[in-house]
A protein has these predicted regions:
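Glycine-rich Rossmann-fold phosphate-binding loop(s) that bind the pyrophosphate
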Residues: 140-141
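NAD(P)-binding Rossmann-fold cofactor-contacting core
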Residues: 153-180
Length: 310
């Protein structure tokens, strides 16, 4: 049996960062989803309702790669009350030739955080206006910070508005984001205030009730919705999704049962026969992305095993 490589979060942080290379790798993974025979089973989820927790298992095999990943990703959303992070996890890296375990990545959720933020940047690169300079962050956790970091690698962001349910946490995030003086950062008292006159909105919360409503949809707006990765989560009102000029999924087979599209279909706001695009199809040139500056677009990101393997 070959030796198994064991890497800690510190090891991984020293060699993998949220940069343009990471964004390009995730972009390639999306393109492969649209053009190659990717093997990606549905997400396995275990709910632990008495502790406000869930565990997701994701995997995918991308043709041509020597290895594939299986990720175990717990999310226990009462953990901050205990002084613990909401998210953690690990990945197993297996040989695509033999199936033997090559490496165990004890990333504590770091790799998931990086690839999730990188996916948001890919969505913005293909669907937001190139001259987008302002963003609303709906959510004030670590993923909101990383989403902004990734977004700034693909768009010339100057103004940031932040809304979160925890006002103290939101204020602390805003202080941190504005510390170097490169950004104009404002903590907002409401989603309405945060959504006023912005080019991009990023929702990254575990909300079970819609936060984005039809009156928030301004011409030219792009929304990246990150939070609805389970049936009970919902950040975008079905009536708002129905008013979009362009809805894009990371994987339609997932967003029809887990994402924002799931809620719109269930509410009857969107037809079951409506034709939608996947992000990989746009990257591969199979479907159009943003066509006109005034379009309102949304990318529904539920997270894919292809991103983890990439």
């Amino acid at each position: 049996m070959p030796a198994i490589t064991l890497l800690s979060e510190a090891d991984l942080r020293s060699c993998i960062t949220l940069d343009r290379d990471a964004i390009d790798a995730i972009e390639q993974a999306f393109a492969l989803l649209a053009t190659a025979k990717v093997a990606m089973p549905p997400i396995l989820r275990l709910d632990v309702p008495e502790h406000n927790g869930e565990v997701d298992v994701k995997t995918a095999y991308l043709p041509g790669l020597e290895r594939f990943a299986i990720k175990v990703s717990p999310g226990f959303f009462d953990n901050p009350k205990l002084g613990l992070p909401s998210l953690n996890g690990m990945m197993m890296l297996l040989s695509a030739r033999t199936g033997l375990l090559d490496a165990l990545l004890l990333d504590n959720g770091y790799l998931t955080a990086v690839r999730t933020a990188a996916a948001g940047a890919v969505a913005a690169r293909w669907l937001s206006r190139q001259d987008s300079r302002s963003v609303a962050l709906i959510g004030s956790g670590e993923q909101a910070r990383l989403q902004l970091q990734a977004l700034r690698l693909v768009r010339p962001i100057e103004q940031v508005k932040v809304w979160g349910r925890d006002a103290q946490r939101t204020a602390a995030l805003c202080d941190d984001l504005g510390r170097d003086g490169q950004l104009q950062v404002k903590a907002c008292d409401s989603v309405d205030q945060a959504m006023q006159a912005v080019d991009i909105a990023i929702t990254c919360t575990p909300s079970r009730e819609p936060l984005i409503q039809p009156h928030h949809l301004q011409p030219g707006l792009h929304i990246t919705a990150m939070g609805s990765d389970a049936e009970h989560k919902n950040e975008i009102a079905p009536t708002a999704l129905a008013r979009l000029d362009r809805y894009v999924a990371d994987r339609l087979s997932q967003t029809r049962v887990l994402g924002e599209l799931h809620h719109a279909l269930r509410a009857g706001a969107v037809s079951q026969q409506a034709v939608h695009s996947e992000l990989g199809q746009i990257i591969a040139g199979l479907h159009p992305g943003r066509v006109q500056a005034e379009e309102v677009t949304l990318c529904d990101l539920t997270g894919t095993g292809a991103q983890d393997t990439a």
